[in-house]
């Protein structure tokens, strides 16, 4: 298989394809590398080149091997994951890959997809989100900002309304879904009004897991040549977003009290729900197993559970 992959110019993707978390609990499978887009703040395309996809058959074979070795969960990763397939024959979409994995690897208990560009989500992927219970109800979105002018200057392909519409639609078809997101604070030319639109977007989309990045110029990128925001102001805005993120997490955790979850054990006492929420058990469990647990309590960072 490796020879076939390298003959397609995909050896670089294949060689870093699998990362293991814990002992037989979760495996990360890189199915795509590089990026065809040129966001004005990003240096990745200059270092990793254009988008390259691992063929679906290779991915399925690898996941079958992981399942045979005892892994209960696989996470599909990539630099620009939703662009997967564009460079392959017939240009399949990420949704096609997800459906194929779930069909051909019936013993895979849980499949996750990592950071995605919501504007590129295809019909089959949305269908999988709605109907495939083995596809976990947790999506991390590459949103970056909540203001249309800043999004344009970032050279993003979505508008604020697109992000809101996607979250509303996904929540409509999968009510238990949670969202994470990347948000940049202090992008060049960002005013207080622009910043408030990011704050409001987090609330309107009901984002839970936030990755906040204070803007830092990357040499050679268009954004580095734009008028910069004062460094102290960037830090203050990033702090505001992080504080909001803590409140969003606390709200989510509180909403889970009394509920039952299937929890994948990362070690003897700690695991993750379907929504990737961290859970600590009162008694030791089998690492790598999936345990049905009742949520009994929560603090600011995690849930607590008893096995049922």
Where are the language model's segments positioned?
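Conserved, mostly hydrophobic/aromatic
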Residues: 39, 59, 76, 113, ...
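Radical SAM enzyme [4Fe-4S]-AdoMet core and its adjacent flexible, acidic
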Residues: 85-104, 154, 160, 214-247
């Amino acid at each position: 298989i490796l020879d076939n992959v390298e003959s397609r110019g995909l050896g670089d993707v294949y060689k870093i394809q699998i990362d293991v978390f814990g002992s037989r609990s979760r495996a990360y499978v890189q199915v795509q590398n590089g990026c065809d887009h040129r966001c004005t703040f990003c240096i990745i395309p200059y270092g990793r080149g254009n988008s390259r996809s691992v063929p679906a058959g290779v991915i399925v074979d690898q996941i079958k091997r992981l399942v045979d070795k005892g892994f209960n969960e696989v996470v599909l990763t990539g630099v620009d994951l939703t662009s997967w397939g564009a460079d392959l024959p017939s240009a399949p979409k990420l949704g096609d890959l997800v459906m194929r994995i779930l069909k051909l690897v019936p013993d895979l208990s849980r499949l996750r997809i990592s950071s995605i560009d919501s504007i590129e989500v295809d019909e089959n992927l949305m269908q999988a989100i709605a109907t495939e219970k083995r596809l976990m109800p947790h999506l991390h979105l590459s949103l970056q900002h909540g203001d249309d002018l800043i999004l344009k200057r970032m050279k993003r392909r979505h508008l604020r309304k697109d992000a809101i519409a996607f979250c509303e639609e996904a929540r409509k078809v999968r009510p238990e879904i949670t969202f994470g997101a990347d948000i940049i604070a202090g992008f060049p030319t960002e005013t207080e009004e622009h910043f408030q639109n990011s704050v409001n977007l987090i609330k309107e989309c009901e984002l839970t897991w936030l990755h906040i990045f204070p803007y830092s110029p990357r040499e050679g990128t268009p954004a580095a040549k734009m008028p910069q925001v004062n460094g102290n102001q960037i830090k203050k805005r990033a702090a505001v977003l992080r504080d909001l993120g803590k409140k969003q997490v606390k709200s989510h955790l509180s909403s889970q009290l009394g509920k039952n979850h299937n929890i994948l054990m990362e070690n003897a006492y700690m695991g993750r729900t379907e929504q990737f929420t961290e859970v600590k058990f009162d008694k030791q469990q089998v690492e790598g197993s999936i345990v049905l647990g009742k949520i009994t309590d929560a603090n600011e960072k995690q849930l607590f559970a008893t096995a049922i």
